[in-house]
Amino acid sequence: MGSNLLMIRSSSATSGGVRMGSGTRPTLTLKDAEAIELTAKGVMAVAPYTSQTQQLTYGNQNWSTSVAGTTDSYLFIRNYEVIDGRSFIPEDIKNNAKVAIIGNTVSTELFGDMNPIDKTLRIGNAPVRVIGLLKTKGESGMGMDQDDLVFIPITTAQKKVFGTDFPGTVKMINVKAQSEEALASAQEDIYDILRRRHRIGKSQEDDFEIRNLAEMQETIKSSAKTMSLLLGAIASVSLLVGGIGIMNIMLVS
């Protein structure tokens, strides 16, 4: 995915004095994403994102998977490629079009060997027409099937498929900076934009959090290195203990 990516989420909500997970207090909106795209410096692409697990049906076939509402920019940011049909166009977002782009796993489970393009499946009770099929990506480094998903326009998700108590909100905003060098300044600019838009005072806490993918990757690498050293130490101790045990048995013999 590259290391010039930022992920912006709503900050944690508090329930009964207990701090919940990030994104539990919806504060980010589609308008926030538009403002970042229009005014933030050093930004190449911006993609609002929201998702739910939904039941898909086509004829007698059904499949449960993640359905994400977003824009064509998300496919660009996350390196998804449409190999048959087309991607989203601005009119799909503007008109809340009931269209979908699907991964290969979903295509196989619902349509078998048939070409899914122009077929109509149901997401819950909402009929949507398949306009695009994604190139196979296989499993991620964490073992997740990257082909088991459906993309629909963000506005369609908000207004016609998901339903929400917080109209216009999104779970996440993904941002791709123009380069790794531009990442830090873009992050600062986005931070200022969101604080202004959300009318957060100087003494008030942020109601959002920005995660730098480069920093996250370094944290993962550091954790993996620490775990490797720990496992090595455990193995060494096990060998030492085993060796002492064998030596004691030989001495007794």
Residue ranges and their predicted role:
Residues M1-S66, S73, T108-E109, E181, ...:
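Hydrophobic, regular-secondary-structure patches
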Residues N174, A182-L183, Q187-I190, G201-A235:
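Peri-transmembrane interface segments
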